[in-house]
Design a protein with these regions (language model features):
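Short beta-strand segments in beta-sandwich/barrel cores
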Residues: 58-59, 75-79, 96
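Ligand-binding loop in jelly-roll beta-barrel domains
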Residues: 74, 101-123
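Short acidic-glycine-tyrosine-enriched beta hairpin
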Residues: 84-101
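Bacterial N-terminal signal peptides that target proteins for export
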Residues: 1-11
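A short glycine-rich, His/Asp/Glu-containing loop-to-beta-strand
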Residues: 33-58, 65-69, 120
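Bacterial Sec-dependent signal peptides at the C-terminal "C-region" and cleavage site
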Residues: 14-28
Length: 123
């Protein structure tokens, strides 16, 4: 590649890097639902977010990478079973659960009490 072409593409690459870094992730739970999710820690390998689920709140559409969820208190809520029925989900304080990457939201929480969860996302 001629030197003048390399020099002319460098500003475009720098501009793309700056603009790309400034664009927020559209489905980042911390960005779309700061009243539910709070960032506790982040580096290049993991991100730790704290989730507070309250009865009657509707989670907006958001996405997670693979993660481990640690329940900071006992939690119970009803979930749709996909066949027109519901089943109760129960988690004990300190219980750790693997959750694969997913995009979800748009459902209203039906919890017995406020539920706090620490989510350790693998980046």
């Amino acid at each position: 590649m001629p030197a003048n072409k390399v020099i002319s593409t460098v500003p475009l690459l720098l501009l793309a890097a700056v603009v790309g870094a400034a664009v927020p992730k559209p489905l980042d739970p911390v960005m779309v639902a700061p009243h539910i999710y709070a960032l506790d820690f982040e580096n290049e390998k993991v991100r730790v977010i704290r989730q507070t689920v309250r009865n009657g709140e509707t989670l907006p559409l958001h996405a997670h990478p693979d993660r481990v969820m640690v329940y900071l208190q006992s939690c119970a809520w009803l979930e749709d079973d996909g066949a027109g029925g519901e089943h109760m989900q129960l988690f004990k304080i300190g219980e750790a659960v693997w959750a694969p990457a997913e995009t979800h939201g748009g459902t209203t929480a039906n919890v017995a009490q406020e539920c706090k969860i620490l989510e350790i996302e693998l980046l």
